[in-house]
């Protein structure tokens, strides 16, 4: 929000009052979730369509207030072609005392990867380009020591030129309830995060990319488990049961005991599972879908894989500036998180207008 306060106007949309700068016109609701509602709008300053998200009850509780601060800090930090970034942030409040609402403005993305998969069978070249961009974005995110945690087709926005942006970081940890049953929230989750095996690392995101890539190649969900146990069985049927070395790393005794009770299964030959796929694609999948997260390929390593030979450019796969996450371990009151958030809103500097805009 720039220092000179713009003129705001109010309107009601879906029983919610929106109070936005005159710069944003023609608001129309496009969706809502637990953490806010989103409208498409026309940005009269740039001539582009944008998404405006109004956070719902951003300071209702300490958890809400910290999540609000986290989301704003993350979005402000992200400056990469393959990652959603912040175009604007504003509040109608004139002072910290009045501050209760936060609005975030990002690119309006036309379709997500779900729409793309459903509509057409993708060529191998399409798959290369899409997965390359996901990994390019992940290399950047991971270099800032951030883990997405929730990569799935609906969190990957794609325009008609096949240009991709990663959306919706796993800001809020999913509740058990959201992970229960036949749900996409879980189908792309690494086993160690789904089953709380151990402290996880950035390669949980690589497992998700493997699941997404397999789906792009076959047109089918790779592990559509009906519940946690069914999902684990589907995973182990493909990658084989864990050996002694991995079992030792699983800190949860109940998880260890359960796995040891299962019949031993060998890893399947991926070439027989992904029949007709480019052998280099199969080789990359074998390196992503590894049960032991310490042995999974990283995003930076995957970008250098031969499968991406026509896209890989080590001089154009940037890393992020360091990201200070020390706030994560802080226990503050609602008003303290609110004050920190207000400072972030006030200090926001918009990206340069001539930046290559991604049209949907």
UniProtKB/Swiss-Prot annotation:
The lineage of its organism: Eukaryota, Metazoa, Chordata, Craniata, Vertebrata. Component of a signaling complex containing at least AKAP13, PKN1, MAPK14, ZAK and MAP2K3. Within this complex, AKAP13 interacts directly with PKN1, which in turn recruits MAPK14, MAP2K3 and ZAK. Binds to a kinase interaction motif within the protein tyrosine phosphatase, PTPRR. This interaction retains MAPK14 in the cytoplasm and prevents nuclear accumulation. Interacts with SPAG9 and GADD45A. Interacts with CDC25B, CDC25C, DUSP1, DUSP10, DUSP16, NP60, SUPT20H and TAB1. Interacts with casein kinase II subunits CSNK2A1 and CSNK2B. Interacts with PPM1D. One of its GO terms (cellular component) is cytoplasm. ATP binds at residues 30-38, 53. The modification Phosphoserine is found at residue 2. GO terms for biological process: angiogenesis; apoptotic process; bone development; cartilage condensation; cell morphogenesis; cell surface receptor protein serine/threonine kinase signaling pathway; cellular response to ionizing radiation; cellular response to lipopolysaccharide. This is Mitogen-activated protein kinase 14. Dually phosphorylated on Thr-180 and Tyr-182 by the MAP2Ks MAP2K3/MKK3, MAP2K4/MKK4 and MAP2K6/MKK6 in response to inflammatory cytokines, environmental stress or growth factors, which activates the enzyme. Dual phosphorylation can also be mediated by TAB1-mediated autophosphorylation. TCR engagement in T-cells also leads to Tyr-323 phosphorylation by ZAP70. Dephosphorylated and inactivated by DUPS1, DUSP10 and DUSP16. PPM1D also mediates dephosphorylation and inactivation of MAPK14.
């Amino acid at each position: 929000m720039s220092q000179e306060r713009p003129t705001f106007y109010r309107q009601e949309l879906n029983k919610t009052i929106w109070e936005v700068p005159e710069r944003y016109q023609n608001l129309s609701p496009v969706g809502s979730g637990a953490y806010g509602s989103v409208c498409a709008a026309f940005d009269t300053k740039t001539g582009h369509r944008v998404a405006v998200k109004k956070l719902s009850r951003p300071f209702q509780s300490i958890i809400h207030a910290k999540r609000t601060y986290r989301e704003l800090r993350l979005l402000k930090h992200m400056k990469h072609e393959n990652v959603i970034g912040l175009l604007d942030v504003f509040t109608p409040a004139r002072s910290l005392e009045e501050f209760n609402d936060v609005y975030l403005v990002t690119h309006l993305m036309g379709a997500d990867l779900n729409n793309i998969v459903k509509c057409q069978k993708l060529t191998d070249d399409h798959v290369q380009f899409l997965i390359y961009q996901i990994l390019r974005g992940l290399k950047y995110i991971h270099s800032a020591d951030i883990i997405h945690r929730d990569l799935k087709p609906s969190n990957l926005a794609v325009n008609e030129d096949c240009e991709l942006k990663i959306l919706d970081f796993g800001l809020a940890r999913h509740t058990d309830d959201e992970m229960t049953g036949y749900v996409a929230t879980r189908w792309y989750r690494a086993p160690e995060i789904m089953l709380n095996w151990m402290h996880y690392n950035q390669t949980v995101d690589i497992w998700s990319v493997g699941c997404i890539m397999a789906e792009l190649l076959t047109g089918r969900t790779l592990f559509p488990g009906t519940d946690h146990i069914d999902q684990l069985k589907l995973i182990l049927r493909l990658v084989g049961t864990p050996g002694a070395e991995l079992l030792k790393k699983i800190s949860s005794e109940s998880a260890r005991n359960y796995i040891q009770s299962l019949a031993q299964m060998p890893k399947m030959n991926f070439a027989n599972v992904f029949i007709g796929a480019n052998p280099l694609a199969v080789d990359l999948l074998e390196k992503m879908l590894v049960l032991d997260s310490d042995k999974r390929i990283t995003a930076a390593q995957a970008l250098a894989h031969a499968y991406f030979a026509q896209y890989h450019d080590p001089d154009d796969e940037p890393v992020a500036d360091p990201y200070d996450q020390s706030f994560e371990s802080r226990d503050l009151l609602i008003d303290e998180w609110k004050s920190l958030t207000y400072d972030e809103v006030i200090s926001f500097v918009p990206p340069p207008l001539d930046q290559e805009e991604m049209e949907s």
